[in-house]
């Protein structure tokens, strides 16, 4: 409900701010012509594929997928504007991909968006 109230303000300032969007809110922004700079997802099931139906609008956004995102979601998206983010956990740090870094993605997409910002 609070997002719906803020959509006109977000639309007015979309070119003056970086917009992070949880995948579940993507359709709401699309309906108002708001293009997020980043779209985040950390779903381990493929139920979230429904949020990524409008591939044309996604071309202008960077899609940040948490390393546990379901493979079907990863495959369905354009690799050019996607990035896989590793959790800040010992299991993932063992991959020794330190040049890429690690993020505390948390357990929900709003935490992931906040940490990424």
Region roles according to the model:
Residues 27-116:
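Acidic/Gly/His-enriched mid-domain segments of enzyme catalytic cores or analogous surface patches
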Residues 19-20, 107:
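Short alpha-helix boundary/capping motifs
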Residues 1-19, 26, 36:
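N-terminal glycine-/serine-/threonine-rich phosphate-binding loop
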Residues 10-11, 20, 54, 98:
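Generic alpha-helix detector with strongest preference for long hydrophobic helices that associate
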């Amino acid at each position: 409900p609070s997002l719906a109230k803020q959509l006109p303000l977000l639309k007015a300032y979309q070119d003056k701010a970086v917009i992070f969007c949880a995948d579940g809110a993507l359709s709401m922004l699309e309906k108002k012509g708001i293009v997020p700079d980043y779209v985040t997802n950390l779903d381990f099931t493929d139920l979230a594929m429904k949020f990524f139906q409008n591939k044309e609008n996604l071309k202008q956004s960077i899609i940040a997928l948490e390393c546990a995102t379901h493979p079907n979601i990863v495959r369905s998206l354009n690799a050019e504007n996607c990035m896989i983010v590793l959790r800040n956990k010992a299991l993932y740090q063992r991959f020794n991909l330190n040049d890429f870094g690690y993020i505390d993605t948390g357990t929900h997409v709003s935490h992931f968006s906040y940490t990424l910002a």
